Swiss-Prot record:
Keywords: ATP-binding, Cell membrane, Membrane, Nucleotide-binding, Translocase, Transport. Belongs to the ABC transporter superfamily. GO terms for molecular function: ATP binding; ATP hydrolysis activity; ATPase-coupled transmembrane transporter activity. It is a peripheral membrane protein. SMART domains: AAA. The keyword Translocase applies. GO terms for cellular component: ATP-binding cassette (ABC) transporter complex. This is Putative ABC transporter ATP-binding protein MA_4342. ATP binds at G40, E41, K42, G43, A44, G45, K46, S47. The keyword Nucleotide-binding applies. InterPro entries: AAA+_ATPase (IPR003593), ABC_transporter-like_ATP-bd (IPR003439), ABC_transporter-like_CS (IPR017871), ABC_transpr_CbiO/EcfA_su (IPR015856), ECF_ABC_transporter_ATP-bd (IPR050095), P-loop_NTPase (IPR027417). Its main location: membrane. It comes from Methanosarcina acetivorans (strain ATCC 35395 / DSM 2834 / JCM 12185 / C2A). Residues 3-238 form the ABC transporter domain.
């Protein structure tokens, strides 16, 4: 069963002069196993939206269910793993081992089961066991993010929810996180990420949700998103669309620089071949 939001609204500072409608009549469905990107400008309501998925916030109106359960149930706390933008704000233990084991211990798993989950999560984020005794705060930004991710994975969630997981990381750190998330999704866990980094995430996304001023203005597949008007696109995709509009026979559904280069060279070769054949016919 999926995460379902039905006619959900949420207000900050309700019934005060500072009342702000963060979400308005939101309807959303996220299936197990999907890789979902939640897009939108700052203040659009993205972070508020994902906090409804496991009961961190309570909607003012409407209904939220996770696999048919209330988001405030203990089982949903296990089902929906959360990873916030700043990993350092989520880490507090003295060692990587303690950090990853924290969730299973608090859910009452045995020592043996907890250790199995720690090693499983460690492997999922591509760390070896030598990391377990390291101080989390001695690690790089990308490594800290992976420790926080391992902590969430130790509960074997059905849905992994992330808020800007690669913001502030260097290129190597971004690459590590993106590869890890793809691996997690391929193993059957739904990955739901708030992101501004279309360049990094777009090739991975299966479903896109666009939030504008507290409302969902688009939800659909990546292919449907590319056909939609007035939606933000990765720079390379915008460039390919512009080339197509100017008459070049390129495929505009390109998401990476590597794909764009390959497509441009393919079209260049084709046009040169056609030009040569035309000259041959003239001769």
């Amino acid at each position: 069963m999926p995460i379902i939001l039905e006619n959900v609204s949420f207000f900050y500072s309700k019934n005060t002069p500072l009342e702000t409608a963060a979400l308005k009549d939101v309807n959303l469905r996220i299936e197990k196993g999907e890789f979902v990107g939640i897009l939108g400008e700052k203040g659009a309501g993205k972070s508020t939206l994902i906090k409804l998925f496991n009961g961190l916030l309570r909607p003012e109106s409407g209904k939220v269910t996770v696999d048919g359960l209330s988001p405030f149930s203990k089982e949903v706390k296990r089902k929906v793993g959360m990873l916030f933008q700043q990993a350092a704000d989520q880490l507090f233990c003295r060692t990587v081992h303690e950090e990853i084991a924290f969730g299973p211990r608090n859910f009452g798993y045995s020592k043996k089961e907890t250790e199995e989950r720690v090693f499983e999560a460690l492997e999922a984020v591509s760390f070896d066991r030598s990391m377990l005794l390291r101080d989390p705060f001695s690690l790089s930004g990308g490594e800290m993010q992976r420790v926080a991710l391992a902590g969430a994975l130790a509960l074997r969630p059905d849905y992994l929810v992330l808020d800007e997981p690669i913001t502030g990381l260097d290129p190597a750190g971004k690459k590590e996180i993106l590869e890890t998330l793809k691996k997690i999704k391929d193993q059957g866990t739904a990955v739901i990420t708030v992101t501004h980094n279309l360049k990094g995430f777009f090739p991975l996304l299966e479903k896109i949700v666009l939030v504008r001023e507290g409302r969902i203005s688009f939800q659909g597949s990546r292919e449907e998103y590319l056909e939609a008007k007035n939606v933000p696109l990765p720079p390379v995709t915008s460039m390919m669309r512009e080339l197509k509009a100017r008459g070049l026979p390129v495929n505009p559904a390109i998401f990476t620089v590597e794909e764009a280069l390959e497509e441009i060279l393919r079209v260049k070769s084709r046009l040169e071949k056609e030009k040569t054949e035309k000259w041959s016919e003239t001769d």
